[in-house]
Amino acid sequence: ETKDSNLLTLGPGWTRKDGYVIGVAVAAGESSWYFPIAHKSGNMSKNIVFKWLQKLCNDEKITKVFHNALYDLGWLRAEGIEVKGKIVDTMIAAPLLDENRKWYNLNSLARDYLGEYKDEKLLKSAAEEFGVDPKSGMWQLPPRYVGKYAEQDALITLKLWDNLRKKITQEECSSIFELENSLLPVLFEMKTKGVRVDVDKAHKTKKDLTKIEKSLIEEIVKETGVTVEPWVATSVAKVFDAVGLSYSRTEKSGSPMFTKQFLANQTHPIAKKIIKIREINKANTTFVDTILEHSHNGRIHCDFHSLRSDGGGTVTGRFSSSNPNLQQIPARDP
């Protein structure tokens, strides 16, 4: 378990050294344990726990089973622990068996393949008492409330792999699984290294685009007296009204409607300016801002997907990325 405050917005914090491990859950056979190391109280010795865990992870005879291995491997490395030997990820096994599932999180897979759920009652009750979110605020809870939940994570992952492994064999997908699973170390090193970006150039590009956008908006103000908000239909309607241009409305509510195609078909210069403002605004907010937001020490550590998952990926198995999507580039308006 971790304190990973910016996980949902910027991705796993281990690439940015943003957060830390609060405890480790381990399962073997039918047993499971939770070792708290960085809660606000009730912790075990971090040095002793990590010394034991390092020995366990270094044993190449032991197969290590994870659900979303890249996340755990990253945080373990951030704490100085390298995992050696065979690594299995149930998030690789699951989409091989069913690439059309809506969800691949542990609870969803456990429900469908094992007929069981993680019991979150104690965790949620404690979170409500302490006034924190049960997941993102877990680090603020005493270990006695987190331990049972964390142990379930580890034990269910082990049970799930036992179930999925049999189904993979039955479906004659073992060789494909081994191939996909063998990519794990490569994907991990790719994410760890990151993709180099020119942050200074990104800042300059943002500044230049903002200047052009502001200039176009000011031109429209001089012509119409309206400070246009390019993505707000009612605002664009005021500009059109000011120069006597007609426009479409939605059938249901009668609200103004300005699609990209409609604006492109207009010959009036002011419509062209609105199109340009939209293009510049999108380039800034969708591409440049994303680069600046996700960059750390001149690199972007995005998530790479070889298969489907809750975080992204494709049904066909085409390689993809997210947080941010590096394949998303402004092809028509470079």
Language-model regions: role of each:
Residues 1-40, 84, 101, 109-114, ...:
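Conserved "right-hand" nucleotidyltransferase catalytic core of DNA-directed polymerases
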Residues 29-64, 195:
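Nucleic-acid-processing active sites and adjacent nucleic-acid-binding tracks
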Residues 52, 72-75, 105-109:
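Alpha-helical scaffold elements adjacent to nucleotide-binding pockets in ATP/GTP-utilizing enzyme cores
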Residues 61-70, 227-229:
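Short glycine-rich phosphate-binding loop at a beta-alpha junction
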Residues 64-67, 87, 178:
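A structural signal for short, well-ordered beta-strand segments and their strand-loop junctions
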Residues 70-73, 97, 101:
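Conserved nucleotide-binding/hydrolysis micro-motifs of P-loop NTPases
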Residues 71-78, 238-239:
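Phosphate- and divalent-cation-binding pockets in alpha/beta enzyme and binding domains
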Residues 82-99, 105-111:
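Conserved beta-strand -> loop -> alpha-helix junction used to position metal-binding or nucleic-acid-contacting
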